[in-house]
């Protein structure tokens, strides 16, 4: 076996180059990975706009079917866990939204390796099917994504109404169940 002596400068460069892998435990996404993620999220945004028109199919197709999938929707409730709950929850939206439009303000987005997230504000105008009155929702949304064998997939969404900021002193006491 032959040993090769390396200088301190080369050792330093090698250590710096390895830092993201060691510190984060996974390779960085790089420009190509980020471009793929951004293209996928563009599909998510288009599909979400369709959901508010009463057509959830395009968005449903972008979700993982793995058991750990979760959805905490803007309509409240205890949330959905597993595709057997998430799928029907998305189906239910067709009875809640029609003639909708969506405007998005992205707050943050990040991708590293096989995981990514997006945090955004969503302004939605829609009608409840069968009603003429237009409604308006302001939503805070967090999406989490994972790259799977067949590409990027949604693994979690948490959305809630954008409400007025309140401190504990301003809240009414709520009875515990």
Tell me what each language-model feature is.
Residues 120-127:
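Generic short beta-strand segments
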Residues 107-111, 159-162, 171-176:
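Glycine-rich beta-strand-turn "strand-cap" elements at beta-sheet edges
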Residues 129-131:
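Extracellular loop and loop/strand-boundary signature of outer-membrane beta-barrel proteins
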Residues 35-39, 56-113, 121, 135-136:
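A solvent-exposed, acidic/Ser-Thr-rich amphipathic alpha-helical stretch
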Residues 117, 138-168:
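Short beta-strand edge/turn micro-motifs at domain boundaries
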Residues 11-22:
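Bacterial N-terminal signal peptides
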Residues 20-65, 114, 170-177:
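Short, low-complexity N-terminal intrinsically disordered segments enriched in polar/charged residues
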Residues 1-6:
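N-terminal secretory signal peptides that target proteins for export/translocation
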């Amino acid at each position: 076996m032959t040993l090769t002596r390396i200088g301190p400068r080369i050792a330093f460069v090698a250590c710096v180059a390895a830092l993201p892998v060691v510190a984060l435990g996974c390779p960085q996404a790089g420009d190509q990975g980020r471009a793929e993620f951004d293209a996928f999220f563009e599909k998510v945004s288009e599909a979400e706009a369709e959901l508010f028109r009463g057509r959830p199919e395009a968005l449903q197709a972008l979700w993982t079917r793995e058991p750990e999938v979760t959805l905490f929707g803007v309509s409240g409730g205890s949330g959905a866990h597993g595709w057997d709950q998430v799928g029907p929850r998305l189906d239910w939206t067709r009875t809640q939204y029609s003639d909708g439009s969506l405007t998005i303000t992205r707050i943050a987005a990040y991708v590293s390796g096989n995981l990514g997230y997006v945090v955004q504000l969503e302004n939605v105008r829609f009608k409840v099917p069968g009603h003429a009155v237009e409604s308006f929702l302001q939503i805070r949304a967090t999406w989490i994504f994972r790259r799977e064998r067949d590409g990027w997939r949604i693994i979690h969404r948490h959305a809630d109404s954008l409400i007025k900021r309140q401190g504990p002193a301003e809240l009414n006491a709520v009875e515990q169940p």
